[in-house]
Regions:
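Acidic, Ser/Pro/Thr-rich low-complexity regulatory regions
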Residues: 1-120
Length: 120
């Protein structure tokens, strides 16, 4: 999936706007990698590994998962949904946490937990 993540990085480098990834990209990647949508989303969710090891930044990862949820996704207990929720938690300050970096307090520990399960 490293090639797919690289393709996404290129999309975000050359395009600007609220939604970079669209339905056409999902269909193209599903066909190219021989994956149904749910499997493709879970494969893309492995970008959590890149965030965890410092090769992908929060803003990129959060933008990717937000774009994907915006296209079409049903809430469930998939790897993708867990990763989405982890990045989503870093988008805003939580009650009683003024001055706390939500990415460090909420996203990073949750991504660490997810990655630990993936690599166990």
């Amino acid at each position: 999936m490293h090639v797919l993540i690289s393709q996404m990085q290129e999309l975000f480098r050359v395009h600007d706007g609220p939604r970079i990834i669209n339905e056409k990209h999902i269909e193209q990647w599903s066909h190219s990698y021989g994956l149904n949508r749910a499997s493709l989303y879970d494969a893309i969710a492995e970008l959590a590994l890149g965030f965890h090891n410092g090769t992908l930044d929060y803003e990129f990862c959060d933008a990717v998962v937000n774009d994907l949820v915006g296209i079409h996704f049903e809430e469930d207990n998939s790897l993708f949904w867990q990763v989405f929720l982890a990045f989503d938690a870093g988008e805003y300050g939580h009650d009683g946490d003024r001055g706390v970096d939500p990415v460090e307090k909420y996203t990073r520990p949750e991504i660490t937990r997810i990655v630990s399960k993936l690599t166990a």
